Amino acid sequence: MGNKRMEYLDYVKGFGILLVVLGHVYAENNYIKIWLYSFHMPLFFIISGILIKHTNVKDRDIKNIIASKFKSLIIPYICFELLAIFVWMVQNEFTLSALKWNITDSMLMYCKAGATWFLPCLFITEVIYLIMIKNIKNDKINVFVSLIIFLIPLILKTNNHYLIVIFRCFIAYGFVTFGYYAYDLIINKEITFKYLIILFILNIVLSQSNG
């Protein structure tokens, strides 16, 4: 299994970013927006799982990986959040308590800069997943644990924001696992165009039926 760059994933990520932008600028809440929201964020987590497998991350030093992920995901998150907090403080009355409240919310992933929740969510999910695959060598156990984690937020629905933050990571964990194990199928070209069409149709049906 080589570490040659999977260039086509750059195109997929570019397409995903375009879908994210469209999802945020498309005001009308109709079937198109529902469909976009059904997969444009999961797509990034699936790609993350594919890249974890492709780069043999589990065989590398986890401290260096975490440091690298922190620089690429958490540092940008902090910068965006500080900028958003600054704008918020300019537009509203500045108080130390308000500043403390805003910073605390950002640390707890109650983001001021909208979709930036994705960055710490991806960081936390990848770190936990790396720890899991380094310690759980049995693929069946890993998949089973991932499935349980993925199903928890689907069963225990909540309106509490801080629980929603945690549940986002749980759902992301499931998609990262899917990408990790889909890697071999992609490399061996076992996922044919026929199966992609089936997945595409299934995605449309499920997204519309679940809203």
Q: What is the meaning of each model-derived region?
A:
Residues 1-211:
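Alpha-helical transmembrane segments and their immediate juxtamembrane cytosolic regions
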